């Protein structure tokens, strides 16, 4: 008995010749979802939000007060035109101000509160600038005892964020003098336009018996007052009970190209080949002493457990530590440059990113090319399209869209003679790969329009994309509608040339679907997802010999006669879940498959 049976469906292994694939593997797969072993499609993308800015390419969601943050249908969307924008929430437990932070390659680091964002109010430059110089004079003292002290000032935002201290003003006076302090003026734009400064703090020194000099808080005044004068008569004994100055080195961040939240409340950022770290739980404070200079320019950052993964134009770097002042780095052995920031995806398994050689997974101190077994370097080069990859985590899969992918075209109407050619098609096509699931392997993805960006929603972990002026959700909950998909089998070789007589395709259930037209058996038909469930195409020795519409599970389809062939391929184009397929050289044999 000669028969072809497909009880299970798997993804592509493009590095293996289509004649040598395992029986379940596809030579071509597009929009297929293969986790169950059945032939299924990716979910239809569900609209969540219509963009206010038609030029926006990426959007992030912040929750509404009192709502479940993971509920995808509620929230305020924050839109950006630069696809390379990073957007994070405050790494502070129960942040009373509900602050959010963002930066990109074209904008300086900024932040805002959720309330202000919902009201459409502008954000502020991240960080608190250094206060200007102050001036001190003395008068009124009669004591012969002299005292030397230094004064500094700091600026404080409405949210309690304190900046670095001003240059110290050193003065000597009598111990009972009144020290007249003229506090620094504040730039008017810092009082609610580019910054949100509300207070000025004044500190002065006390020298301990051991000779240690420490700054203590003298007073805090309203920054909105135009001329700030303060007369200091506080004794050292009283001052010693006041708070200490902590923010001496809490400088604002440079123009970071990107950042990410590390464990222990540290925010890591980068520009060029410099790696920067904030104070723990203080994302406004970025001491320059904490910055590290790396060998290669940084492309982007990822996180795996307690470790920061730095993807560069050379070797990947890992960085770890619980204190931003003592972060240690390790250069991994593999020279695997990162092609694009958008390709970086942080997962439980590690950090994925695209290199010229394939998709790289960094974990446990090593970098592994996980597509090496699936895809040749030449094919990967056309898929990666010079790094134009934007990706997210769909279930356990790496789900990406690119600026151009290999597209299979043919001489005739259908995909009868595949020729791989690189066609620039914007970002309407991409791929899905899951190295943790051998059945899934690799599959192409396709949309009807350009996908501007792919992200994981920070509140739910769900994949969202921006397309056609909308934010869309890939909803994998049970019962989802599926996209039309294409799956083409390996080339099956029979022992000698034969003519297959008939086949059956088994669907999951008998879907309730109203067919407006007669069942189509035209070999030149094209699949219409609006009026059809599935088409099965059969190829013999590379030639399309049958294309028939399938309407019911297990219905019998006869194949044309008058020829024999030794190499057979089966192609499904459908929007219904397929359980299995059977094809034999006679009706009797088909009943025994």
Language-model features, listed with the residues they occupy:
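Surface-exposed extracellular loop regions of Gram-negative outer-membrane beta-barrel proteins
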Residues: 308-333
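Beta-strand initiation motifs
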Residues: 162, 211-213, 239-241, 283-286, ...
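Surface loop/turn motifs at the tips and blade-to-blade linkers of beta-strand repeat domains
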Residues: 222-223, 290-294, 331-336, 381-382, ...
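WD40 beta-propeller blade core
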Residues: 276, 317-318, 360, 472
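Disordered, low-complexity "stalk" and linker segments at domain junctions of extracellular
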Residues: 2-30, 35-40, 45, 54, ...
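Beta-sheet repeat architectures centered on beta-propellers
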Residues: 2-104, 148, 158-160, 173-178, ...
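Surface-exposed loop/turn positions within WD40 beta-propeller blades
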Residues: 97, 105-106, 264, 272-273, ...
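Loop/turn segments within WD40 beta-propeller blades
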Residues: 302-304, 344-348
């Amino acid at each position: 008995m000669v028969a072809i049976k497909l009880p299970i469906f798997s993804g592509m292994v493009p590095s293996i010749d289509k004649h040598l694939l395992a029986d379940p593997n596809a030579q071509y797969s597009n929009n297929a979802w293969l986790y169950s072993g059945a032939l299924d499609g990716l979910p239809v993308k569900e609209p969540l939000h219509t963009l206010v800015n038609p030029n926006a390419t990426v959007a992030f969601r912040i929750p509404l007060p009192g709502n479940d943050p993971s509920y995808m249908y509620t929230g305020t969307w924050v839109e950006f035109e630069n696809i390379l924008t990073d957007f994070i929430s405050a790494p502070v437990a129960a942040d009373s101000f509900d602050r959010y932070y963002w930066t990109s390659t074209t904008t300086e680091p900024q932040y805002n509160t959720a309330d202000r964002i919902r009201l459409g109010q502008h954000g502020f430059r991240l960080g608190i600038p250094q206060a200007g110089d102050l001036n001190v004079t003395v008068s009124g003292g009669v004591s012969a005892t002299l005292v030397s002290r230094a004064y500094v000032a700091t600026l404080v935002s409405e949210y309690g964020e304190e900046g670095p201290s001003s240059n110290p003003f050193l003065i000597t006076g009598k111990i009972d003098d009144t020290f007249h302090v003229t506090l620094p003026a504040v730039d008017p734009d810092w009082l609610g336009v580019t910054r949100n400064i509300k207070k000025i703090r004044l500190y002065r020194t006390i020298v301990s018996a051991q000779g240690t000099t420490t700054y203590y808080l003298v007073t805090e005044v309203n920054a909105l007052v135009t001329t700030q004068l303060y007369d200091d008569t506080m004794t050292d004994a009283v001052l010693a009970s006041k708070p200490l100055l902590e923010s001496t080195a809490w400088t604002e961040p440079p123009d970071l190209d990107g950042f990410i939240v590390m464990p222990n409340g540290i925010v890591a950022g980068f520009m060029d080949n410099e790696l920067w770290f904030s104070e723990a739980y203080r994302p406004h404070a970025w001491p320059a002493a904490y910055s590290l200079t790396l060998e290669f320019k940084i492309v982007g950052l990822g996180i795996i457990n307690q470790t920061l993964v730095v993807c560069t134009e050379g070797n990947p770097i890992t960085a770890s530590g619980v204190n931003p002042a003592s972060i240690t780095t390790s250069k991994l052995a593999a020279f695997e440059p990162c092609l694009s920031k958008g390709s970086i995806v942080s997962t439980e398994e590690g950090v994925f990113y695209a290199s010229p050689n394939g998709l790289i997974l960094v974990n446990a101190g090593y970098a592994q090319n996980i597509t090496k077994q699936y895809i040749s370097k030449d094919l990967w080069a056309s898929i990666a399209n010079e790094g134009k990859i934007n990706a997210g985590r769909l279930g356990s899969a790496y789900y990406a869209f690119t600026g151009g992918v290999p597209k299979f075209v043919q001489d005739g109407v259908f995909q009868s003679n595949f020729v791989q050619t690189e066609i620039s098609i914007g970002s309407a096509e991409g791929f899905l790969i899951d190295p943790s699931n051998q059945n899934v392997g690799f599959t192409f993805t396709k949309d009807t329009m350009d996908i501007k960006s792919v992200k994981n929603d920070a509140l739910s972990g769900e994949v969202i994309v921006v397309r056609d002026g909308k934010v869309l959700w890939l909803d994998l909950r049970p019962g989802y509608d599926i996209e039309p998909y294409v799956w083409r089998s390996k080339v099956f070789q029979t022992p000698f040339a034969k003519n297959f007589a008939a086949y059956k395709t088994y669907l999951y259930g008998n879907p309730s679907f109203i067919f407006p037209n007669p069942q189509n058996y035209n070999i030149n038909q094209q699949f219409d997802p609006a009026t059809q469930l599935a088409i099965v195409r059969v190829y013999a020795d590379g030639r399309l010999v049958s294309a028939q519409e399938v309407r019911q599970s297990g219905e019998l389809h006869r194949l044309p006669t008058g020829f024999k062939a030794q190499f057979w391929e089966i192609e499904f184009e459908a929007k219904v879940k397929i359980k299995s397929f059977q094809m034999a050289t006679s009706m009797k044999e088909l009943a025994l498959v």
